[in-house]
């Protein structure tokens, strides 16, 4: 279903897309198509601008549930992660349903995926409980630039707009958020701060379109709004600026700009 953010009313019924639970979605920022991933291991592109919402592309390299999806800022590359520990990079311009990169560098499910907004080929991924690493990739070559052990399950990732900082959210056993700084010259990812406000596993992150705020939601049923990437003194970084139980989502395509809807 597609919902109106202002009224909460359903506006489009996408019908039967997958043969299993559909647990992850991603908007292509250029084509405005919706990409869906499912327990049936398939990935579909849906064109919501056309009557009937036709399926325009199928990707089926995964053998288990697709649990992570993210389009690059230019809409040319899709990153997908699966429960079989596989990360795939797909070229949107290629008609063949085969990824140009397929890697099992992670030792657990790849749910957390985030593209750097200012470095087109820089991709961050996070592994589950049996992996517990954040990996940075050169998406052009498929090479791992850095692998950082976090000591805990990685559930979400979000980049700053232009400062090379990365926010990670975590589940078992730390239930925290961390801010890291990526030094490309040294190929090092260094932790700056930890934020422990959730009382249970942090499930996911969502970022406002202007990058000024990040929302985290946990299994404690609380949504927290953070000012994380503050360029001022460290005292301003990681500030909790809101706490809610009415959980919705930011989306620049339908919301029409920044803000929590």
Predicted regions and their residues:
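Loop/turn segments within WD40 beta-propeller blades
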Residues: 25-32, 70-76, 114-120, 150, ...
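WD40-repeat beta-propellers
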Residues: 1-4, 43-47, 87-92, 113, ...
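WD40/WD-repeat beta-propeller blade N-cap
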Residues: 15-22, 59-66, 103-110, 149-154, ...
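A short beta-strand motif characteristic of beta-propeller blades
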Residues: 9-14, 54-59, 98-103, 143-148, ...
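Conserved strand-to-loop turn within each blade of WD40 beta-propeller repeats
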Residues: 37-40, 80-84, 126-130, 169-173, ...
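Solenoidal tandem-repeat scaffolds enriched in leucines and small polar residues
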Residues: 20-96
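Terminal intrinsically disordered, low-complexity extensions flanking WD-repeat/beta-propeller proteins
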Residues: 151-153, 160-162, 173-179, 183-261
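WD40/WD-repeat beta-propeller blade-loop signature
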Residues: 21, 30, 65, 74, ...
């Amino acid at each position: 279903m597609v919902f109106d953010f202002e009224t909460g009313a359903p506006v489009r019924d996408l019908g039967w897309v997958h043969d299993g639970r559909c647990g992850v979605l991603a908007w292509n920022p250029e084509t405005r198509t919706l990409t869906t991933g499912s327990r049936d291991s398939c990935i579909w592109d849906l064109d919501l601008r056309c009557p009937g919402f036709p399926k325009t592309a199928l990707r089926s390299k995964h053998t288990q549930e697709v649990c992570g999806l993210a389009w690059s800022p230019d809409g040319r590359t899709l990153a997908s992660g699966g429960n079989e520990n596989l990360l795939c990079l797909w070229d949107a311009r290629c008609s063949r349903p085969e990824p140009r990169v397929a890697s099992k560098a992670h030792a657990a499910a790849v749910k957390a995926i985030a593209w750097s907004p200012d470095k087109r080929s820089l991709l961050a991924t996070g592994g589950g409980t049996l992996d517990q690493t954040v990996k940075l990739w050169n998406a052009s070559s498929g090479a791992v630039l850095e692998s950082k052990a976090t000591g805990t399950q990685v559930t979400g990732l979000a980049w700053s707009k232009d400062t090379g900082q990365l926010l990670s959210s975590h589940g078992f056993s730390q239930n925290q958020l961390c801010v890291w700084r990526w030094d490309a010259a040294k190929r090092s990812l260094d932790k700056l701060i930890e934020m422990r406000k959730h009382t249970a596993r942090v499930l996911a992150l969502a970022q406002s379109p202007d990058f000024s705020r990040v929302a985290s939601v946990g299994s404690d049923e609380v949504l927290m709004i953070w000012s994380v990437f503050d360029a001022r003194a460290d005292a301003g970084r990681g500030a909790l600026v809101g706490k809610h139980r009415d959980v919705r989502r930011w989306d620049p395509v339908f919301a029409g700009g920044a803000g929590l809807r």
